[in-house]
Amino acid sequence: FRRKIIIKVPQRKKYAVIDVFAGPGGLNEGFVQRDNIFGPFVSIEKDSVSCRTLKVRKIYHLLKNSKKKNSDYIEFISNQSNLDEFLDLPKHNKLKSIIDNSIWNHELGALDSKKTAKEIKKRLKNQGWDEKKGDGVIIIGGPPCQAYSIAGRSRRSQMIKSGEYNPH
């Protein structure tokens, strides 16, 4: 006589991640790698080049475990298609929707805070986040890197010319 024991494991709660001043996504990367706990994601970045990098990384993470789709990614990375052409292919409609909701090329402060919050919620909901079910949210981000920003370099060159620059 065998007895079957069924253990119900509660589903682990997932936390949406809002990455402000995302840059190319370095801080976000660790959270993305733990997608069993964290997700969906909204990365907010004002620099369009950094947003392109975020999109390429998002494509990589979405396709890396799919053998069929992995060949699409390899084709894309091999420069046989550009990012827009790749995402505009009908077979990538779902992928494009995720990318469009995950990455927001936007300067924080350009809209009032209520409009910004509404847009972020919309993007999270479009990816399956449900505030009413108690889905959590984590906000990550850091200040813009002044040492490498265009404004920071310009300001430093002016300080050097005027003798005000002190690197220590």
Could you describe each region identified by the protein language model?
Residues 1-168:
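Conserved active-site and SAM-binding loop architecture
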